[in-house]
Amino acid sequence: MTAILSQKVLRQMAFRWLAPSQSHHPLTIHTDTTDFFKIEYNDVVVLNSKPYLIRHNAREGRFGLDDEVKFWVKRAIDLKTGNLKIIKLVFYERFKTRIGGIEFECFRSPKKEARILDVVNGHSNFMHGYSIEDKEGNIVRVLDYIFGKSLHAYIGDLNMDHHTYFYNFFPDILRNFMKCIEAIRFLHQHAEKHGDIRRDHILIDRDSGRYRWIDFDFNYRHRENIYGYDLFGLGNVLIFLVGMGDVLLLDLKNQDHPALGELREEDVNIVFNNRVANLKKIYPYIPESLNRVLMHFSKGTNWFYENTTQLLDDLREFKMLV
């Protein structure tokens, strides 16, 4: 196939997504994705003879970072099927973080995410896709697009008092989140870890209603418990769900909340010290069996969960008692 014919065929395939003013202009074609800043809207990325029409860059969707562009993550159209995809290009970063005196070295690993996509193929609580190398050997991940909002956004959109939420909505949310914990256990049983567990990394699938994990490309090193960072992440999400959002010390102070005087240093989140983990002091109707679970992720804990089974067992005990 000549370059001219290739351009002609690609324009025919992309015609319905191109503006009339662009339908006769040559398309920029990329087979090397190393410099992802050069890959722009309406360009075509070709991977193993399969063309993808690039749409917008993805954006960070949490904690006021809605405008932070992720230039290495692109929305794209599979021009052979017309399906919407997410294309993740190779991007490396590395940092260290400390939780409760434990240091973790974190880094992005496209190879690790590619492995996990194979492991979780067909598992209903994970995103799906495949990896492929471009002509320069970059590991590109092509992901099925999940229609639906994040768990973070879903909780943030709820408009009710906490008591109503806790008794009428939280039980079903917890049931679904426990399936997410079971999914992380599945990963750990396969000697893999998620690496970046956050509430905006769970999408609620609009079609199935299932909670699905996304973004597995972070990895971390820690000598004592290789799954510890995942467990701290699960605890942060659980505290967020029980509280119907973050319970912040500053908000309590601004509200002159009566519980503020009862809070101690050991009652805050071990990772985020401006958030309350001991939620029973804020909402006294939270059962002690559930609050005990939360306190394992507090600054005052003297015992950390070592695996997801321990966490699931305690949550099941809470469910049996209510």
Language-model segments: residues:
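Juxta-kinase regulatory segment immediately upstream of eukaryotic protein kinase catalytic domains
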Residues: T2-G64
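ATP-binding glycine-rich loop module of kinase domains
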Residues: E60-D118
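Conserved HxN/HPN-centered segment at the entrance to the catalytic loop
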Residues: R115-E133
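Conserved structural core of kinase catalytic domains
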Residues: M127-N168
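Activation segment signature within eukaryotic-like protein kinase domains
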Residues: N176-F177
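Catalytic-loop of the protein kinase fold
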Residues: I184-I204
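C-lobe/activation-segment region of protein kinase-like
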Residues: Y211-V293
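A conserved short helix/loop substructure at the end of the activation segment
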Residues: S298-Q310
